Amino acid sequence: MKHLPIIALDFPSGQEALAFLEPFEGTPLFVKVGMELFYQEGPVILEALKEKNCRIFLDLKLHDIPTTVKKAMNRLAVLGVDLVNVHAAGGKQMMQAALEGLESGTPAGQKRPDIIAVTQLTSTSEDMMRSELLIDRSLQETVIRYGQLAYESGLDGVVCSVHESKALHEHISPDFLTVTPGIRLLNDQTDDQKRVATPAYAKEQGVSQIVVGRSITKADKPLEAYHQILKEWE
């Protein structure tokens, strides 16, 4: 069986996030806690989710000097989450430091969380790269390069769009995790994300794991939407 779809809990408070999850009681879930929710609630929300037997992707996208990132990862390692991330743009030294901090901070006898690197945000377009960031390479070239750096740094995978997943597996390793946000059911709004795809297309492209937010959290019947996505994905 593939990894479960990750539900992005993009809510401003723990109360709203936990209320949203009530209809899912008894359903095995993998959820994502991002900056908004974690900065509001802190580790308390993680404990509440673990009580519901949720697996957790703590999506904080660390990006700072290596020493700071290492110390931060050392602290995150004790929180008992399953997946964490950094920005690949921080470079190899920073990514290696993140991994070291995670390994040294993971309590004895426990598996360390998987760690992945963000390549290019799904809101990024090639036009933006050229006009604002002065990057002349193609978007796919930069994603593959960031992926190679993450792999060389010992990380478990990357965050990318569905459209780069196959190329990453071909250039790096079929076992390298590709975790892809920007997943929508057909006819759903894309909002601020530019590089989006359906669960079925993600499956075709060999994606390791999908992250789904609004197609579930904004659905009239979230549990039904989740099972529709699960059916397409499996």
From Swiss-Prot:
A GO CC term attached to the entry: cytosol
Keywords: Decarboxylase, Lyase, Pyrimidine biosynthesis
Matches recorded under PROSITE patterns: OMPDECASE
Ligand binding (substrate): 10, 32, 59-68, 122, 184, 193, 213-214
GO BP: 'de novo' pyrimidine nucleobase biosynthetic process; 'de novo' UMP biosynthetic process
Tagged with keyword Lyase: yes
Name of the top EC class for this enzyme: lyase
EC number annotated for this UniProt entry: 4.1.1.23
Molecular function GO terms recorded: orotidine-5'-phosphate decarboxylase activity
Active-site residues, Swiss-Prot/TrEMBL: K61
Catalysis performed (reactions): orotidine 5'-phosphate + H(+) = UMP + CO2
InterPro entries named among the record's database cross-references: Aldolase_TIM, OMPdecase, OMPdecase_AS, OMPdecase_bac, OMPdeCOase_dom, RibuloseP-bd_barrel
One Pfam family of this chain: OMPdecase
Pathway the protein acts in: Pyrimidine metabolism; UMP biosynthesis via de novo pathway; UMP from orotate: step 2/2
Positions in coiled-coil regions: none
Lyase as UniProt keyword: yes
Domain of life of the source: Bacteria
Family per record: Belongs to the OMP decarboxylase family. Type 1 subfamily.
Oligomer and partners: Homodimer.
HAMAP family per the UniProt record, alphabetical: OMPdecase_type1_B
Biological role: Catalyzes the decarboxylation of orotidine 5'-monophosphate (OMP) to uridine 5'-monophosphate (UMP).
Name of the protein in its database record: Orotidine 5'-phosphate decarboxylase
Name of the gene: pyrF
